[in-house]
Amino acid sequence: MRTIRRTTAAIVVAAGALIAATTVAGAITGGADDDPVDPTHPNVGIVVFYQPDGRFRCSGTLVHPRVVVTAAHCTFGDVGKVAVSFDTEVAPDAAAGRRVIPRALDDLGFGEEGSGFDDGLWIVELDADGNPLPHYPYDNTGFADGTADGSPVWVTGTALTHPDYSDFTDIKNWNDTGVVILDEAITGVATAALPPEGYLDGIPQKALVKELIRTVGYGTEVRQADTGPQAPTPMSFPIRRQLTDEKPQKLTSQILQMNGNERDPFGGGGTCFGDSGGPAFHGGYIVGDTSYGYTSNCRYLGGYQRVDIPVVRSWLVCVLNNAGSGAAAATAACGSLD
Protein backbone atom coordinates (compact mmCIF):
# COMPACT_ATOMS: atom_id res chain seq x y z
CA MET A 1 0.00 0.00 0.00
CA ARG A 2 1.26 3.42 -0.88
CA THR A 3 -0.06 6.45 1.01
CA ILE A 4 0.10 9.94 -0.45
CA ARG A 5 -0.24 12.74 2.07
CA ARG A 6 -2.12 15.88 1.19
CA THR A 7 -2.50 19.12 3.12
CA THR A 8 -6.18 18.44 3.81
CA ALA A 9 -6.44 14.63 3.88
CA ALA A 10 -4.58 11.40 3.53
CA ILE A 11 -5.27 9.83 0.16
CA VAL A 12 -4.71 6.11 0.42
CA VAL A 13 -4.02 4.18 -2.75
CA ALA A 14 -6.22 1.11 -2.98
CA ALA A 15 -3.63 -1.32 -4.33
CA GLY A 16 -3.18 -4.33 -2.09
CA ALA A 17 0.00 -6.07 -0.99
CA LEU A 18 -0.23 -9.84 -1.25
CA ILE A 19 0.60 -10.44 2.37
CA ALA A 20 0.32 -13.63 4.39
CA ALA A 21 -2.76 -13.23 6.59
CA THR A 22 -4.51 -16.08 8.35
CA THR A 23 -7.87 -14.47 9.09
CA VAL A 24 -10.66 -15.22 6.66
CA ALA A 25 -12.45 -12.18 5.25
CA GLY A 26 -14.20 -11.02 2.13
CA ALA A 27 -13.38 -8.35 -0.39
CA ILE A 28 -15.34 -5.16 -1.11
CA THR A 29 -16.50 -3.67 2.20
CA GLY A 30 -20.14 -4.53 2.80
CA GLY A 31 -20.41 -6.30 -0.53
CA ALA A 32 -21.49 -9.71 -1.73
CA ASP A 33 -19.65 -12.55 -3.44
CA ASP A 34 -20.09 -12.89 -7.18
CA ASP A 35 -21.73 -16.20 -8.09
CA PRO A 36 -18.99 -18.68 -9.11
CA VAL A 37 -21.42 -20.71 -11.22
CA ASP A 38 -23.29 -17.88 -12.93
CA PRO A 39 -21.17 -14.78 -12.29
CA THR A 40 -22.64 -11.32 -12.73
CA HIS A 41 -19.32 -9.76 -13.71
CA PRO A 42 -17.13 -12.41 -15.39
CA ASN A 43 -15.22 -9.67 -17.23
CA VAL A 44 -13.72 -8.33 -13.98
CA GLY A 45 -10.39 -9.91 -13.08
CA ILE A 46 -7.57 -9.74 -10.57
CA VAL A 47 -4.36 -8.05 -11.74
CA VAL A 48 -1.13 -9.15 -10.04
CA PHE A 49 1.82 -6.85 -10.66
CA TYR A 50 5.42 -6.79 -9.60
CA GLN A 51 7.56 -3.91 -8.38
CA PRO A 52 10.96 -3.74 -6.67
CA ASP A 53 9.32 -3.59 -3.24
CA GLY A 54 7.07 -6.60 -3.70
CA ARG A 55 4.11 -8.23 -5.38
CA PHE A 56 0.73 -6.50 -5.29
CA ARG A 57 -2.81 -7.00 -6.46
CA CYS A 58 -5.32 -4.77 -8.17
CA SER A 59 -8.51 -5.38 -10.11
CA GLY A 60 -9.39 -4.65 -13.72
CA THR A 61 -12.03 -4.94 -16.44
CA LEU A 62 -11.86 -6.68 -19.80
CA VAL A 63 -12.94 -4.11 -22.41
CA HIS A 64 -11.41 -5.87 -25.42
CA PRO A 65 -10.32 -9.50 -25.81
CA ARG A 66 -6.75 -8.34 -25.17
CA VAL A 67 -7.23 -5.23 -23.02
CA VAL A 68 -7.87 -4.96 -19.28
CA VAL A 69 -8.55 -1.47 -17.90
CA THR A 70 -7.12 -0.85 -14.44
CA ALA A 71 -5.60 2.06 -12.48
CA ALA A 72 -2.41 3.85 -13.50
CA HIS A 73 -1.02 3.47 -9.98
CA CYS A 74 -1.22 -0.30 -10.59
CA THR A 75 0.72 -0.15 -13.87
CA PHE A 76 3.22 2.68 -13.33
CA GLY A 77 6.65 1.35 -12.39
CA ASP A 78 5.83 -2.30 -12.93
CA VAL A 79 8.71 -4.69 -13.57
CA GLY A 80 8.29 -7.46 -16.11
CA LYS A 81 4.97 -8.99 -17.02
CA VAL A 82 1.62 -8.66 -15.26
CA ALA A 83 -0.60 -11.65 -14.39
CA VAL A 84 -4.38 -11.57 -14.80
CA SER A 85 -7.03 -14.11 -13.81
CA PHE A 86 -10.79 -14.01 -14.28
CA ASP A 87 -11.51 -16.81 -11.82
CA THR A 88 -14.21 -15.86 -9.33
CA GLU A 89 -12.17 -17.14 -6.39
CA VAL A 90 -8.39 -17.03 -6.52
CA ALA A 91 -7.26 -18.12 -3.06
CA PRO A 92 -9.36 -19.04 -0.02
CA ASP A 93 -6.52 -18.45 2.43
CA ALA A 94 -2.88 -17.40 2.71
CA ALA A 95 -1.49 -20.90 2.28
CA ALA A 96 -3.33 -21.31 -1.00
CA GLY A 97 -2.31 -17.83 -2.06
CA ARG A 98 1.36 -18.68 -1.67
CA ARG A 99 0.90 -21.64 -3.98
CA VAL A 100 -1.47 -20.43 -6.68
CA ILE A 101 -0.54 -16.76 -7.19
CA PRO A 102 2.45 -16.37 -9.55
CA ARG A 103 5.65 -15.17 -7.93
CA ALA A 104 7.51 -13.27 -10.63
CA LEU A 105 6.70 -13.90 -14.24
CA ASP A 106 10.31 -14.20 -15.33
CA ASP A 107 10.80 -17.38 -13.32
CA LEU A 108 8.90 -20.66 -13.24
CA GLY A 109 7.38 -20.12 -9.84
CA PHE A 110 9.57 -22.59 -7.98
CA GLY A 111 11.46 -20.17 -5.77
CA GLU A 112 14.02 -18.51 -8.03
CA GLU A 113 14.20 -14.80 -7.40
CA GLY A 114 13.25 -12.64 -10.38
CA SER A 115 12.25 -9.11 -11.30
CA GLY A 116 9.82 -7.59 -8.87
CA PHE A 117 10.08 -10.56 -6.53
CA ASP A 118 10.71 -9.58 -2.92
CA ASP A 119 12.11 -12.59 -1.07
CA GLY A 120 10.91 -11.16 2.22
CA LEU A 121 7.28 -11.66 1.23
CA TRP A 122 7.52 -15.40 0.77
CA ILE A 123 7.30 -18.35 3.11
CA VAL A 124 8.77 -21.64 1.88
CA GLU A 125 6.49 -24.52 2.86
CA LEU A 126 7.91 -28.02 3.39
CA ASP A 127 6.39 -31.43 2.79
CA ALA A 128 6.49 -34.31 5.30
CA ASP A 129 10.05 -35.15 4.25
CA GLY A 130 11.28 -31.59 4.66
CA ASN A 131 11.42 -30.83 0.95
CA PRO A 132 10.23 -27.41 -0.31
CA LEU A 133 6.76 -27.46 -1.80
CA PRO A 134 6.68 -25.75 -5.20
CA HIS A 135 4.49 -22.80 -5.90
CA TYR A 136 1.86 -23.42 -8.52
CA PRO A 137 3.73 -23.90 -11.82
CA TYR A 138 2.94 -22.28 -15.15
CA ASP A 139 4.68 -22.42 -18.47
CA ASN A 140 6.78 -19.74 -20.13
CA THR A 141 3.79 -18.14 -21.84
CA GLY A 142 2.38 -17.38 -18.43
CA PHE A 143 -0.69 -19.62 -18.70
CA ALA A 144 -1.32 -21.86 -15.71
CA ASP A 145 -2.92 -25.23 -16.28
CA GLY A 146 -5.50 -24.70 -13.59
CA THR A 147 -8.09 -27.16 -14.84
CA ALA A 148 -6.82 -30.24 -13.01
CA ASP A 149 -7.13 -29.08 -9.40
CA GLY A 150 -9.34 -26.01 -9.63
CA SER A 151 -6.47 -23.56 -9.25
CA PRO A 152 -6.89 -20.24 -11.07
CA VAL A 153 -5.83 -19.83 -14.67
CA TRP A 154 -3.46 -16.93 -15.32
CA VAL A 155 -2.63 -15.04 -18.49
CA THR A 156 0.29 -12.66 -18.82
CA GLY A 157 0.28 -9.17 -20.22
CA THR A 158 2.18 -5.91 -20.51
CA ALA A 159 1.23 -2.86 -18.47
CA LEU A 160 0.74 0.54 -20.09
CA THR A 161 0.15 3.75 -18.14
CA HIS A 162 -1.78 6.80 -19.30
CA PRO A 163 0.89 9.18 -20.60
CA ASP A 164 -0.62 12.08 -18.63
CA TYR A 165 -0.92 10.25 -15.31
CA SER A 166 0.09 12.73 -12.61
CA ASP A 167 1.00 10.18 -9.92
CA PHE A 168 -1.40 11.88 -7.49
CA THR A 169 0.22 15.30 -7.83
CA ASP A 170 -2.45 17.20 -9.79
CA ILE A 171 -6.15 16.75 -9.00
CA LYS A 172 -7.07 18.56 -12.22
CA ASN A 173 -4.98 16.11 -14.25
CA TRP A 174 -5.38 12.94 -12.21
CA ASN A 175 -5.63 10.48 -15.13
CA ASP A 176 -5.28 7.40 -12.91
CA THR A 177 -5.97 4.89 -15.67
CA GLY A 178 -3.77 2.15 -17.06
CA VAL A 179 -4.24 -0.97 -19.13
CA VAL A 180 -2.83 -4.45 -19.46
CA ILE A 181 -2.34 -5.67 -23.04
CA LEU A 182 -2.77 -9.43 -22.76
CA ASP A 183 -0.41 -11.75 -24.61
CA GLU A 184 -3.36 -13.82 -25.79
CA ALA A 185 -7.01 -12.92 -26.35
CA ILE A 186 -9.61 -13.94 -23.78
CA THR A 187 -12.47 -15.86 -25.37
CA GLY A 188 -15.88 -16.74 -24.01
CA VAL A 189 -16.16 -13.61 -21.85
CA ALA A 190 -18.27 -10.63 -22.90
CA THR A 191 -16.26 -7.41 -22.77
CA ALA A 192 -17.43 -4.31 -20.91
CA ALA A 193 -18.29 -1.20 -22.91
CA LEU A 194 -16.66 2.19 -22.62
CA PRO A 195 -19.14 5.02 -22.03
CA PRO A 196 -19.90 7.77 -24.51
CA GLU A 197 -17.71 10.81 -24.01
CA GLY A 198 -19.04 12.98 -21.18
CA TYR A 199 -21.54 10.33 -20.11
CA LEU A 200 -21.56 11.30 -16.42
CA ASP A 201 -21.81 15.00 -17.25
CA GLY A 202 -25.12 14.22 -18.91
CA ILE A 203 -26.65 13.20 -15.58
CA PRO A 204 -27.74 16.24 -13.51
CA GLN A 205 -26.02 16.39 -10.13
CA LYS A 206 -29.31 16.09 -8.23
CA ALA A 207 -30.16 12.99 -10.21
CA LEU A 208 -26.66 11.50 -10.01
CA VAL A 209 -26.59 11.43 -6.20
CA LYS A 210 -29.79 9.37 -6.26
CA GLU A 211 -28.25 6.72 -8.51
CA LEU A 212 -26.43 3.54 -7.52
CA ILE A 213 -23.04 2.75 -9.05
CA ARG A 214 -21.91 -0.88 -9.11
CA THR A 215 -18.30 -1.45 -8.03
CA VAL A 216 -16.46 -4.76 -8.34
CA GLY A 217 -13.07 -6.00 -7.20
CA TYR A 218 -10.79 -8.53 -5.52
CA GLY A 219 -9.75 -6.39 -2.59
CA THR A 220 -9.78 -6.64 1.18
CA GLU A 221 -12.59 -6.15 3.64
CA VAL A 222 -12.18 -4.18 6.84
CA ARG A 223 -13.55 -6.23 9.73
CA GLN A 224 -12.75 -7.55 13.16
CA ALA A 225 -10.35 -10.45 13.30
CA ASP A 226 -11.58 -13.85 14.46
CA THR A 227 -8.93 -13.82 17.19
CA GLY A 228 -6.58 -11.30 18.74
CA PRO A 229 -7.10 -7.52 18.66
CA GLN A 230 -10.66 -6.63 17.68
CA ALA A 231 -9.97 -3.29 16.02
CA PRO A 232 -11.31 -3.40 12.44
CA THR A 233 -8.43 -4.00 10.04
CA PRO A 234 -8.09 -4.91 6.34
CA MET A 235 -8.09 -8.69 5.86
CA SER A 236 -6.32 -10.11 2.82
CA PHE A 237 -8.05 -13.47 2.35
CA PRO A 238 -9.98 -15.02 0.78
CA ILE A 239 -9.18 -13.36 -2.53
CA ARG A 240 -12.36 -13.48 -4.57
CA ARG A 241 -14.52 -11.29 -6.75
CA GLN A 242 -17.05 -9.22 -4.82
CA LEU A 243 -19.46 -6.46 -5.73
CA THR A 244 -21.52 -3.74 -4.14
CA ASP A 245 -23.57 -0.67 -5.05
CA GLU A 246 -22.39 2.78 -3.98
CA LYS A 247 -24.01 6.18 -3.74
CA PRO A 248 -22.32 9.01 -5.67
CA GLN A 249 -21.62 12.18 -3.72
CA LYS A 250 -20.10 14.54 -6.24
CA LEU A 251 -18.57 14.73 -9.68
CA THR A 252 -15.49 16.70 -10.70
CA SER A 253 -13.76 17.07 -14.04
CA GLN A 254 -11.64 13.99 -13.19
CA ILE A 255 -13.17 12.13 -10.25
CA LEU A 256 -16.44 10.47 -9.29
CA GLN A 257 -16.58 10.52 -5.50
CA MET A 258 -18.77 8.00 -3.69
CA ASN A 259 -19.67 6.99 -0.15
CA GLY A 260 -18.17 3.62 0.74
CA ASN A 261 -19.68 3.22 4.20
CA GLU A 262 -21.65 -0.02 4.38
CA ARG A 263 -23.95 1.61 6.95
CA ASP A 264 -25.12 4.16 4.43
CA PRO A 265 -28.90 3.49 4.25
CA PHE A 266 -28.87 4.14 0.52
CA GLY A 267 -25.73 2.23 -0.48
CA GLY A 268 -24.11 -1.11 0.18
CA GLY A 269 -20.50 -0.35 1.07
CA GLY A 270 -17.40 0.50 -0.91
CA THR A 271 -13.97 -0.50 -2.14
CA CYS A 272 -10.76 -1.22 -0.24
CA PHE A 273 -7.13 -2.29 -0.80
CA GLY A 274 -6.79 -4.54 -3.83
CA ASP A 275 -9.91 -3.12 -5.48
CA SER A 276 -7.78 -0.46 -7.22
CA GLY A 277 -8.42 -0.37 -10.94
CA GLY A 278 -11.68 -2.26 -10.59
CA PRO A 279 -14.72 -0.92 -12.41
CA ALA A 280 -17.50 1.44 -11.50
CA PHE A 281 -20.47 0.44 -13.67
CA HIS A 282 -23.52 2.50 -14.59
CA GLY A 283 -25.99 2.19 -17.42
CA GLY A 284 -24.19 -0.80 -18.87
CA TYR A 285 -20.89 1.10 -19.14
CA ILE A 286 -17.65 1.16 -17.18
CA VAL A 287 -17.64 4.80 -16.10
CA GLY A 288 -14.64 4.76 -13.78
CA ASP A 289 -11.83 2.80 -12.17
CA THR A 290 -11.13 2.65 -8.43
CA SER A 291 -8.41 5.16 -7.57
CA TYR A 292 -8.16 6.01 -3.86
CA GLY A 293 -9.78 6.26 -0.46
CA TYR A 294 -9.46 8.80 2.33
CA THR A 295 -8.72 6.51 5.27
CA SER A 296 -6.56 3.49 6.01
CA ASN A 297 -9.55 1.39 7.10
CA CYS A 298 -11.71 2.17 4.03
CA ARG A 299 -15.47 2.40 4.74
CA TYR A 300 -15.51 6.11 3.91
CA LEU A 301 -15.29 8.25 0.79
CA GLY A 302 -13.69 6.79 -2.32
CA GLY A 303 -12.43 8.39 -5.51
CA TYR A 304 -12.98 6.81 -8.93
CA GLN A 305 -11.10 7.95 -12.00
CA ARG A 306 -13.59 8.91 -14.69
CA VAL A 307 -13.01 7.11 -17.98
CA ASP A 308 -15.68 9.08 -19.85
CA ILE A 309 -13.63 12.28 -19.98
CA PRO A 310 -11.88 13.05 -23.29
CA VAL A 311 -8.28 12.81 -22.03
CA VAL A 312 -8.83 9.29 -20.67
CA ARG A 313 -11.39 7.92 -23.09
CA SER A 314 -9.47 8.97 -26.21
CA TRP A 315 -6.36 7.17 -24.94
CA LEU A 316 -8.37 4.04 -24.18
CA VAL A 317 -9.97 4.09 -27.63
CA CYS A 318 -6.51 4.37 -29.19
CA VAL A 319 -5.30 1.41 -27.13
CA LEU A 320 -8.30 -0.68 -28.13
CA ASN A 321 -7.74 0.13 -31.78
CA ASN A 322 -4.11 -1.01 -31.61
CA ALA A 323 -4.22 -3.82 -29.06
CA GLY A 324 -4.63 -6.51 -31.68
CA SER A 325 -1.09 -5.76 -32.85
CA GLY A 326 0.35 -6.12 -29.36
CA ALA A 327 1.68 -3.95 -26.55
CA ALA A 328 4.56 -2.46 -28.54
CA ALA A 329 2.22 -1.25 -31.27
CA ALA A 330 -0.24 0.18 -28.75
CA THR A 331 2.56 1.97 -26.92
CA ALA A 332 3.96 3.45 -30.13
CA ALA A 333 0.55 4.66 -31.29
CA CYS A 334 -0.95 5.83 -28.00
CA GLY A 335 1.92 6.46 -25.58
CA SER A 336 2.64 5.14 -22.12
CA LEU A 337 4.26 6.79 -19.11
CA ASP A 338 7.53 5.02 -18.31
Language-model region placement:
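Short loop/turn motifs at secondary-structure junctions and domain boundaries
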Residues: 50-53, 263-264, 269-272
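Short amphipathic beta-strand segments in non-cytosolic proteins
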Residues: 46-48
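Chymotrypsin/trypsin-fold serine protease catalytic domain
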Residues: 173-268, 302, 309-316
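C-terminal region of N-terminal signal peptides and the immediate post-cleavage residues
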Residues: 19-36, 81, 327-338
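Secretory targeting and sorting signals
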Residues: 1-27
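Short, solvent-exposed aromatic-acidic interface loops
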Residues: 75, 163-165, 260-265, 291-295
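C-terminal subregion of chymotrypsin/trypsin-like serine protease catalytic domains
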Residues: 40-41, 57, 62-76, 82-92, ...
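Conserved catalytic-core segment of clan PA serine endopeptidases
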Residues: 29-40, 50-52, 82-188, 198-200
